[in-house]
């Protein structure tokens, strides 16, 4: 069964729209227009044009074969466009932004009639370009890369003559830092909206849809939850390109729905441990919002080669419903490392409770260079020592067995403030560690050790190195947005990171931390469980 992409409700806004008539050689485009709602998924690939993946082959094959996926309650199919940009473009608009230079931009669009209440479709994610993304989400803090779900108002443009599919003329412009451009990290000048003008194939060969508008997704972060579930594609693309050699490449299932959500992820814990604790106290104005952004990156190994990383982005939103004075919202972040030679003793369930503003996950491309962290001056992360050594970690998946094999896990927690919060400088809270992941053969109760991957070996040459894990992310009662570790009862005040210089963060007692632990042996999160 093909993954499904659903839009939970029709577009409720009329955006600024500029219909544009394109003119080709020997073809004059004059037509009438009618307004339609367009759910558009803009996918920006890596800025390095040399980075290519087999997914492009299938992407093109879908176009060449003129295949259309079934779209329920809709009268149009899925179109695509690709354009190589030789130089960077930029503009400044509103609060969503993407910058692209010297790479490929792919824009996919699902068009439905405006009178429909909603749209559900069964699509090949490769045709949507989801598996074609380089580092839209997975490269933590990489400026200029983004995967953004947009809602657009489009217009049908009926052409006078039949024409072939035209490349997209995108204007995905501006700088992007995963929404942290309002945190005083030097990205404020690059704030801009994602503005796209795309030629979208209509139901007839002589009809295209010109789309130009502003995305509305970022303005209302509590409307959608987008969740990834991995699967293995069961078909190649033909012509010797793409998935013939990489049938293990992950598929992506994207589910869009408003939800009171819960995210459960399995991680491993053993005896030796190290600890990171951070706490940031921020002030919110009335009707403001506090967003704790949890970014988890996993490098996935295929049979004998790198299959590509998986990026997971979760925004957890807590609104301030009313306050005469700015409300102090506490964000506590605890990270803990566990290592031991031997068997992994247990799994810790990590739960995120509360209203989830957005969770975006996407399968990324195979190039290991996509894991390079961008500007260390803007976002403080720990260098990835695993990238210099090609290790094999088998059948251990700290993100709930989304995919078969992983190499490393990186966790970054960012705390940011919404648009209407009290304007003041706040330092980003970033807790990140990179470590080898357990080399194990199974993850069913007891874990059999497969091989040594690093460090001193035991008598039998067996060793397990477990990736440093991260905290549960959860919203406590009241107006506190709390993140606490499932296996740690102690928060050390001396390790507390503060939101701004001179602001003394309140110490967190052991009793406070003891209320947040959660231990679970449940399986990976599903779209249905999160939707609940």
Swiss-Prot record:
Q: In which pathway does it act?
A: Carotenoid biosynthesis; lycopene biosynthesis
Keyword check for Membrane, yes or no. Answer: no
Task: Please provide the Gene Ontology terms (biological process) for this protein.
Answer: carotenoid biosynthetic process
Q: Residue spans with biased composition (Polar residues)?
A: 509-519
Specify the protein name: Phytoene dehydrogenase
> What's an example of a GO molecular-function annotation for this chain?
oxidoreductase activity
As recorded in UniProt, its EC number(s) are 1.3.99.-
Quick one: where's region Disordered? 497-532
């Amino acid at each position: 069964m093909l993954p499904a992409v659903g839009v939970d409700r029709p577009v409720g806004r009329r955006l600024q729209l500029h219909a544009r008539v394109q003119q080709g050689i020997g073809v004059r485009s004059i037509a009438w227009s009618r307004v339609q709602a367009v759910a558009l998924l803009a996918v920006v690939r890596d800025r390095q044009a040399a980075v290519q993946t087999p997914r492009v082959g299938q992407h093109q094959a879908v176009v060449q074969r003129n295949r259309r996926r079934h779209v329920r309650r809709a009268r149009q199919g899925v179109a695509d466009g690709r354009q190589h940009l030789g130089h960077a473009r930029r503009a400044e608009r509103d609060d969503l932004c993407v910058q692209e230079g010297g790479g490929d931009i792919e824009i996919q669009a699902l068009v439905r009639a405006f009178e429909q209440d909603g749209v559900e479709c069964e699509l090949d994610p490769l045709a949507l370009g989801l598996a074609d993304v380089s580092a839209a989400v997975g490269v933590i803090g990489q400026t200029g890369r983004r995967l953004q779900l947009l809602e657009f108002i489009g217009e049908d443009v009926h052409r006078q003559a039949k024409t072939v599919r035209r490349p997209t003329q995108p204007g995905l412009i501006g700088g992007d830092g995963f929404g942290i451009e309002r945190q005083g990290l030097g990205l404020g000048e690059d704030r801009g909206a994602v503005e796209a003008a795309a030629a979208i194939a209509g139901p007839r060969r002589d009809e295209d849809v010109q789309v130009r508008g502003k995305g509305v997704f970022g303005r209302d972060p509590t409307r959608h939850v987008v969740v990834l579930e991995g699967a293995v594609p069961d078909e190649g693309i033909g012509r010797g390109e793409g998935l013939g050699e990489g049938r293990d490449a992950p598929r992506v299932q994207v589910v869009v729905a408003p939800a009171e959500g819960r995210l459960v992820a399995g991680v491993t814990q053993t005896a030796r441990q190290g600890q990171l604790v951070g706490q940031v106290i921020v002030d919110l104005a009335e009707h403001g919002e506090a967003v704790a952004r949890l970014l988890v990156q996993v490098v996935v190994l295929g049979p004998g080669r790198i299959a590509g990383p998986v990026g997971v982005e979760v925004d957890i939103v807590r609104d301030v419903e009313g306050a005469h004075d700015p409300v102090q919202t506490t964000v506590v972040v605890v990270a803990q490392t566990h290592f031991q030679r031997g068997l992994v003793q247990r799994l810790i369930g990590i739960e995120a409770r509360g209203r989830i503003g957005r969770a975006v996950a996407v399968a990324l491309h195979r190039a290991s260079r996509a894991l390079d962290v961008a500007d260390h001056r803007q976002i403080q992360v720990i260098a990835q020592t695993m990238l210099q050594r090609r290790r094999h970690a088998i059948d251990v998946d700290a993100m709930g067995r989304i995919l078969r094999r992983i190499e490393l896990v990186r966790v970054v927690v960012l705390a940011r403030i919404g648009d209407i919060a009290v304007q003041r400088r706040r330092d980003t809270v970033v807790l990140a560690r990179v470590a080898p992941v357990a080399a194990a053969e199974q993850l069913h109760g007891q874990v059999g050790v497969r091989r040594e991957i690093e460090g001193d070996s035991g008598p039998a040459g067996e060793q397990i190195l477990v990736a440093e894990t991260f905290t549960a992310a959860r919203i406590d009662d009241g107006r506190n947005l709390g993140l606490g570790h499932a296996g740690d009862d102690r928060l050390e005040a001396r390790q507390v990171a503060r939101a701004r210089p001179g602001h003394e963060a309140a110490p967190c007692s052991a009793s406070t931390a003891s209320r947040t632990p959660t231990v679970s042996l449940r399986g990976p999160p599903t779209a249905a469980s999160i939707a609940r």
